[in-house]
Design a protein with these regions (language model features):
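Positively charged, small/polar-rich N-terminal and surface patches that mediate targeting and assembly
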Residues: 1-112
């Protein structure tokens, strides 16, 4: 089992969600986050004063999936999130030691 985490542009969330649903991902967790990488920040004008916005709004998507689904999940996220411009995001894949469905007590792949 793996936890696939992606940091993407907020306006690409619907496309990514649809792509993941299309390959059978049954649930995701979405968190609004801020960060910067190569994209860096930008300068804004507020009440006549310029200031630098260092952290840009992003969306973090997390999906716990079976090992055999990981490559398809990565492809779905890439296709849904890609604009071809700096700041499209990153995908991280982590091993999951254990998963437990609290309601039923199911564990492992059955809990996904």
């Amino acid at each position: 089992m793996k936890l696939v985490t992606a940091i993407i542009k907020p306006f690409k969330l619907d496309e990514v969600r649809e792509a993941l649903s299309g390959i059978g991902v049954q649930g995701i967790t979405v968190t609004e986050v801020k960060g910067f990488g190569r994209q860096k920040g930008h300068t804004e004008l507020y009440r006549g004063a310029e200031y630098v916005v260092d952290f840009l709004p992003k969306v973090k998507i997390e999906a716990a999936v079976a090992d055999e689904l990981v490559d398809r999940v990565i492809e779905a996220i890439e296709s849904g999130a890609r604009t071809g411009k700096i700041g499209d995001g990153k995908i991280f894949v982590y091993d999951l030691q254990q998963v437990v469905r609290i309601r039923t007590g199911e564990t492992g792949a059955e809990a996904l």
